[in-house]
């Protein structure tokens, strides 16, 4: 989820997202602001104001190759330059002293092609976003009770070929999309922090 606090493309405030998440039955949310991870003190304040919701912070990194990779790791208030090369991102991540989880977000949002740059990314991330509000925008069809991207096959083929963990995300930038699409995970207890979530 993106907030107006850190992502210029969002019109949703952090507190409003938290309120809506609880109203819509979510147990947890992950803020994935563009290029920056929430500062620990600010995230702590938001968590304190919303004890009924588990709040995590990752970062969505826009790459020079034209794709976006989300990083979930121990909160270290990360900041990455816009259009960093994927190889440089991996180098930066190698300096982290803790595990991290990466996934490519909406890789086929504009086309179904798989150029060599995308193949390289797919071969080195842990997961792939198969559906989100922004993937569906202007290119969806309904199959039974689900809305799917028109190019669902491209997403599923990449996920299967590379053995990637499938993710279904709101990718919320506005109130209406909070919880519209969500991951359902069968955990006995929610991870206490980003480090456990990444594992």
Locate predicted features.
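Charged catalytic cores and adjacent phosphate/nucleic-acid-binding surfaces used
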Residues: 2, 7, 19, 41-44, ...
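Active-site-adjacent beta->alpha loops and helix N-cap segments on the catalytic face
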Residues: 36-43, 83-95, 145-149
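Mid-domain alpha/beta scaffold segments of enzyme catalytic cores
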Residues: 15-16, 20-23, 27, 35-65
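Binuclear metal-dependent hydrolase catalytic cores centered on His/Asp/Glu-rich metal-binding motifs
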Residues: 69-101
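Mobile, glycine- and charge-enriched loop segments
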Residues: 1-10, 52-54, 72, 93-99
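Internal, conserved structured core segments that host functional sites
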Residues: 94-107, 115-122
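Active-site neighborhood of phospho(di)ester-bond hydrolases with catalytic His/Asp-centered motifs
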Residues: 1, 28-34, 56-59, 102-106, ...
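A short helix->loop->beta-strand "cap" motif at the edges of active sites that frequently abuts
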Residues: 26, 53, 98, 161-164
